[in-house]
Amino acid sequence: MSLPDGPRTPPTLQLIQWIANPLSFMRNCSERYGDSFTVYFGEKMSRAVVFSDPQSLQIILTSDESKQFDAPGELNVVFEPLLGAQSVIGLSGDRHRRMRHLMMPPFHGERMRSYGELIADITDEVMRGCVIGKRFVLRKCMQTITLRVILRAVFGLEEGLRYRQMERALVSLLDASSTRLSVGFLYFPILRQNLGPLSPWGSFVRKREWIDRLIYDEIAERRTQQDTNRNDVLTLLMSAHDEAGEALTNGELRDELMTLLAAGHETTASALTWAL
């Protein structure tokens, strides 16, 4: 299969350009090579074909009956430092299918509709904090809404000490993960040098460990309580079993919670901001 043309610069240089200014890099490629082009993001990564035409994306997402297009988990291995080695987006084959099967029940239509009132209440709570006639940053409000929805609907936390600790810890880690340097950590393992809590990577590791302690404490507490009346995603994941009767381990639960956080926080906040 022939691939669209694209930049001929060394793969590592393409990756650096993308990390430094992704919008500029993609825009320049689109203007030079058209609606589809091929890039190389790093020496060990496969070629990636980028599509910027909405009609092409629609065909890929809705008309791929022959399953020509695939998204193997290996392409997402760069997110392992944040999401963990057992995240569903980093798995392939049978392991991926098993995890998807276990994660599907909490996201059935009726279950999702039951979260509507909670989402509306959180939205009202956050927006009431905005002063009429005074400027505010909309994206910040959307980030707060999505994070609190995740804490309540996914993690199942109620207002209290652990809720506040988790909110602070997640904001701290997500802020640290959104810098260009942190993206460099994901793609260039040689940069992951833990030189103490004040070093960039050391600070990231410390914040991740803080999150992990809070998550594992919450999981341990839930296993002790065994409250089957709760309808948050964590409770439903803990009660799920695969075809062999195996439940998710604590490590798998942690990684999937972090995956849901990463997938539902920044992306949803950005989409809501653009929509408004």
Which residue stretches match the model-derived regions?
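N-terminal membrane-proximal hinge/A-helix region immediately C-terminal to the signal-anchor transmembrane segment
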Residues: 1-85, 89-98, 113, 117-125, ...
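Cytochrome P450 heme-thiolate monooxygenase catalytic core
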Residues: 1-3, 68-79, 95, 111-270
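Generic hydrophobic alpha-helical segments
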Residues: 26, 219, 257, 275-276
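Short hydrophobic alpha-helical segments that form membrane-spanning helices or hydrophobic packing faces
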Residues: 60-61, 268-276
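Active-site catalytic pocket residues across diverse enzymes, especially alpha/beta-hydrolases
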Residues: 64-65, 241, 276
